[in-house]
């Protein structure tokens, strides 16, 4: 079953499900019903899911939804009074009766939280969801970050916890903080009274990934700045500061954590080499700079870290060739630029994807614009597949930072992506089997030069799901089935 955020124009944005048929596509539950003023007027559609839409052709930014083996976890609002300001974790088994808020971890605060000047702490709802699928007798769980203060209670009885690492199995009793990295040691004054102690910030864990039974993430403290941590879920595990990479309080600002082989790659600044590629096996002594790609303090700022077999592909700027494609086997000698794709500047590869042992990505050159490329990790084996939008114009314009959703995805034995071939078809659904002749338009959903702007691809069973736009229907859910091959909306 496919779960997604949908809006039927009546109930607002809610959790929906689909089995790929019209009859099997319906709202799971109206968790946040219509809200009106005291006179029963000025009603809103409600909607429990927070969706931001803007003028982009690609529409909206949607809430986090992750799936275990038998449960769905997502973030949203159920309309409980006092909880409107921050999202909580919602759990669902796909039925209305089995869909509910796990715990209202943030409610509107006691005025005393604000201190003498009425300062309001930054509200951090549940986010950064990472699912741990059920195993044996342990049910599906999700790790997430949240700032907690229980509503209806005074600051005396329940001081606030800053944003920290939590876990839940979907029940209140199974919801608890994993690690309180920054303790509640802040004090303040309000209305002539002194209050102690609380925390309005927390360690703000970020870049959460699961590697075996261990959660790797970054967190920030006054003592170390933002550094690399891990938390072992097994017996004898617990919290560990992997390494104070940039010794002192400044922090190394680690990011882009990616599991490859026995360790984790990341980008970090040790205070000497700038932001460079690191590899860690989980402790201080074996967390090292792989290579000083851009010598000196400027750093190469590794991005787009992507696993292919036992190697890591990524992009970096060595200070001479611009941002290009690199590969690493975790050794200095095995870390090198694959190819200087744009010899007059940066090709800025992005949307790196792996299919059948080959890397596919979008890259820019002055002659062809941004187009689809492939690489086997060698210079000769790195080349453009097809100039979809002929000449210097690009067929692909979007960066992962701009768009929160999939525009490039592996499905079955093909890579599907959104592309614009110029004036003939507009921006539509394309696919490739890895050859120039096999790189082709799937269907012109809005005939002619107008565009359907397909996006948010998701591969499920034998179908490719996505959203697509037309003036008649607006943006709707579609799927593509390669056998027998129709597009169905």
Which stretches of residues belong to each language-model region?
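Feature 14080 marks short, conserved micro-sites in well-ordered regions
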Residues: 1-489
């Amino acid at each position: 079953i496919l779960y997604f955020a949908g809006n039927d124009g009546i109930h607002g944005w809610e959790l929906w499900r689909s089995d790929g048929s019209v009859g099997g596509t319906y709202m799971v539950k109206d968790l946040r019903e219509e809200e009106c003023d005291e006179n029963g007027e000025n009603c809103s559609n409600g909607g429990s899911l927070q969706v931001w839409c803007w003028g982009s052709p690609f529409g909206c930014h949607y809430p986090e939804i992750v799936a275990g083996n038998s449960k769905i976890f997502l973030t949203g609002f159920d309309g409980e009074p006092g909880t409107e300001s921050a999202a909580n974790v919602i759990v669902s088994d796909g039925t209305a009766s089995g869909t509910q808020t796990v715990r209202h971890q943030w409610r509107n605060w006691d005025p005393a939280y604000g201190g003498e000047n009425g300062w309001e702490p930054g509200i951090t709802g549940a986010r950064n969801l990472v699912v741990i699928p059920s195993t044996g007798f342990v049910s599906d769980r999700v790790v997430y970050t949240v700032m907690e203060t229980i509503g209806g209670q005074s600051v005396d009885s329940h001081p606030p916890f800053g944003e920290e690492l939590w876990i839940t199995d979907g029940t209140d009793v199974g919801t608890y903080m994993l690690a309180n990295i920054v303790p509640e040691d802040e004090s303040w004054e309000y209305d002539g009274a002194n209050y102690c102690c609380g925390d309005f910030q927390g360690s703000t864990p970020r870049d959460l990934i699961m590697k075996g039974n261990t959660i790797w993430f970054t967190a920030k403290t006054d003592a170390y700045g933002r550094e690399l941590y891990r938390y072992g879920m097994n017996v004898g595990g617990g919290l560990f500061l992997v390494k104070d990479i940039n010794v002192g309080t400044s922090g190394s600002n680690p990011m882009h954590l990616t599991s490859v082989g026995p360790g984790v790659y990341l980008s970090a600044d040790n205070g000497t080499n700038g932001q460079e590629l690191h590899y860690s096996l989980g402790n201080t002594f074996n967390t090292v700079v792989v290579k000083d790609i851009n010598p000196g303090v400027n750093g190469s700022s590794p991005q787009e870290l992507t696993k292919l077999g036992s190697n890591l592909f990524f992009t970096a700027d060595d200070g001479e060739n611009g941002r290009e494609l690199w590969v690493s086997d975790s050794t200095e000698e095995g870390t090198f630029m694959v190819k200087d794709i744009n010899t007059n500047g940066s090709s800025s590869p992005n949307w790196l994807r792996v299919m059948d042992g080959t890397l596919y990505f979008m890259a820019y050159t002055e002659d062809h614009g941004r187009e689809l490329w492939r690489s086997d990790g060698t210079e000769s084996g790195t080349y453009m597949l097809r100039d979809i939008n002929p000449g210097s114009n690009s067929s692909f314009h979007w960066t992962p930072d701009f768009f929160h959703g999939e525009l490039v995805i592996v499905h079955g034995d093909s890579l599907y992506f959104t592309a614009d071939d110029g004036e003939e078809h507009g921006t539509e659904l394309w696919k490739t089997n890895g050859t120039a002749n096999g790189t082709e338009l799937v269907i012109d959903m809005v005939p002619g030069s107008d565009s359907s702007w397909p996006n948010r691809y998701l591969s499920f069973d034998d179908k490719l799901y996505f959203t697509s736009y037309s003036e008649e229907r607006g943006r709707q859910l579609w799927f593509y089935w390669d056998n027998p091959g129709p597009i169905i909306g």
